[in-house]
């Protein structure tokens, strides 16, 4: 599956949006990938995650388990794990970091691929990878459907992206005038309070 094929899936779902968005990272961007509109269609999610699983196997070989960060990584993590024929587990935010809960655990030395939906700065990925390492897992790679950083995000392990985009993202105090003139939408989930 090519970059264009992946973006076509997002376009077909109405999930490639343009405007002025505050991302979960707190950065501002003229482009937002509304992944939930992609993942809500099982056949679309299956195509993307099957291709990601194939890319994982071609890059690092077989793994023992796929671990994802809740909430956004659960669906692509599960579907990718299904195509890898390995268990899918996830970590949840607790006390400022990610933790294994709900009976999930790793056996020491298990080969783990960390599966994300979208990577922008790599912060959530790094936090998830740290939780995996703390639990004794051997993180052989991280994988995502889309790397918005164009390969610049450092997650601390090799990053396998089904598609890579170089989408600009700016801190609030460094917005270009044309972006600052557009009303802000805040579709990110990190700042939601439950």
From Swiss-Prot:
Taxon lineage: Bacteria, Pseudomonadati, Pseudomonadota, Alphaproteobacteria, Caulobacterales
What is the name of the protein in this document? Orotate phosphoribosyltransferase
Pfam families, A to Z: Pribosyltran
Subunit annotation: Homodimer.
Q: Which InterPro entries match?
A: OPRT (IPR023031), Orotate_PRibTrfase_bac (IPR006273), PRibTrfase_dom (IPR000836), PRTase-like (IPR029057)
Q: What is its EC number?
A: 2.4.2.10
Output the superkingdom of the source species.
Bacteria
GO biological process terms, alphabetically, are: 'de novo' UMP biosynthetic process; pyrimidine nucleobase biosynthetic process
Entry's Gene Ontology molecular function annotations: magnesium ion binding; orotate phosphoribosyltransferase activity
Report residues binding orotate.
120, 148
The entry sums up its family as follows: Belongs to the purine/pyrimidine phosphoribosyltransferase family. PyrE subfamily.
Q: In which pathway does it act?
A: Pyrimidine metabolism; UMP biosynthesis via de novo pathway; UMP from orotate: step 1/2
Q: Please explain the role this protein plays, according to its UniProt record.
A: Catalyzes the transfer of a ribosyl phosphate group from 5-phosphoribose 1-diphosphate to orotate, leading to the formation of orotidine monophosphate (OMP).
Which keywords fit this entry according to its UniProt record? Glycosyltransferase, Magnesium, Pyrimidine biosynthesis, Transferase
Enumerate the catalysed reactions. orotidine 5'-phosphate + diphosphate = orotate + 5-phospho-alpha-D-ribose 1-diphosphate
Identify the cofactor(s).
Mg(2+)
The entry marks the following residues as binding 5-phospho-alpha-D-ribose 1-diphosphate, namely: 116-124
